[in-house]
Swiss-Prot record:
Site annotation Important for tRNA discrimination: residues: K85
One of the record's GO cellular component terms: cytosol
Binding site for ATP: R214, A215, E216, R222, H223, L224, E361, G409, A410, E411, R412
Region (Aspartate) location: 192-195
Annotated catalysed reactions: tRNA(Asp) + L-aspartate + ATP = L-aspartyl-tRNA(Asp) + AMP + diphosphate
Function according to Swiss-Prot or TrEMBL: Catalyzes the attachment of L-aspartate to tRNA(Asp) in a two-step reaction: L-aspartate is first activated by ATP to form Asp-AMP and then transferred to the acceptor end of tRNA(Asp).
Main location: cytoplasm
Protein name: Aspartate--tRNA(Asp) ligase
CDD domains: AsxRS_core, ND_PkAspRS_like_N
Enzyme Commission number(s) from the entry: 6.1.1.12
Organism: Pyrococcus furiosus (strain ATCC 43587 / DSM 3638 / JCM 8422 / Vc1)
Summary of subunit composition and partner proteins: Homodimer.
Amino acid sequence: MLRTHYSNEITEELNGKRVKVAGWVQEVKDLGGIKFVWIRDREGIVQITAPKKKVSEEIFKLIPKLNSEDVVVVEGIVNFTPKAKLGFEIIPEKFEILNRTQTPLPLDPTGKVKAELDTRLDNRFIDLRNPKVMAIFKIRSNVFRAIREFFYNEGFIEIHTPKIIATATEGGTELFPIKYFENDAFLAQSPQLYKQIMMATGLDKVFETAPIFRAEEHNTTRHLNEAWSIDAEIAFIENEEEVMDVLENLVVYAINYVREHNERELKILEFELEEPKQPFPRVTYDKALEILSDLGKEIPWGEDIDTEGEKLLGKYMSENEGVELYFIYKYPSEAKPFYIMKYDEKPEICRAFDLEYRGIEISSGGQREHRYEVLLEQIKEKGLNPESFEFYLKAFKYGMPPHGGFGLGAERLIMRMLNIGNIREVILFPRDRKRLIP
């Protein structure tokens, strides 16, 4: 390898030892008889100090010719000294330019010169050199790591379902059509039907992390047309509240994992991530509408709570209950998909729930209808053709246990966790209504 150490691996035990560091030139300072170079790598900054009397003439002449963002590798001796900004410096013995950068740069990777979001996204490879941007994606990586760890610890089995499908998951029109040889097909908007089929196999508890595709024309700070979904399905449940328990514990596990393993990144972002308060409050749909009505926001019974309503409710729960995460459940059946189980004693209400985080829905789930005849009728009630769902319905004919699950939006979870205002900030190459490149 071209480097022996990242910047954060240089400790006092290495004082007087030879190391090799590599990265991008962040800053050069020429004070005549002494020259400085600050090199940035994935983990931080390294100071290279080149006194004329201690380095070769070749290195001394090379340093002033460096440009910001040149890629370099430096071999030298570590010197811990209070005179260095970072507490240590490297006196270079070898200094190699691996690649020159063109100038001017399309944006400033330090973030000192502000750039529009579109400019940043068009040049994402430079944007990520900004420590604050990189911190987001290090946290994202650990969120996915924590999620997998949680599921495996809880006895879940990881599955991978098709992303090219023949029919709509929920009967909607918000699908991206594609040509599949002589057939018409679509990009999957959810693994919903497939993870439910898995409940008839005996696997009992499954999860998947994968992209989903939704042809919604929303162009907002909270919508993407390609996003990552964290899906789970659990067999042999008694009711939807058991699924809510799993989702709550998953989200808490992920947040606390970031708190423990991303202290440096949170410090870079100047953000204090608080431990979630448990248990998450569980607010019925009717109660949510009552709260909103008291706040001057009227929503007709049976309709979804809109963006404004979510924000108002989020503010109310924060100010009055001191919580950022809470469930809304017991929704009107007409507001939820065909596969959600209704209450037998009150069929206008169903066993669905949403998880809200700081006024944004980050997850939906519920107990599913596992009884074949009832499910068939619910498909018809939604105006859908059962023949389009034959592959799915077949699994319900031969022994389908009671089950439930959820889908959790990874980007929404991360943007709310870090209190970031635009969902495009937390995915590398966003796909939205107007962005297809890069």
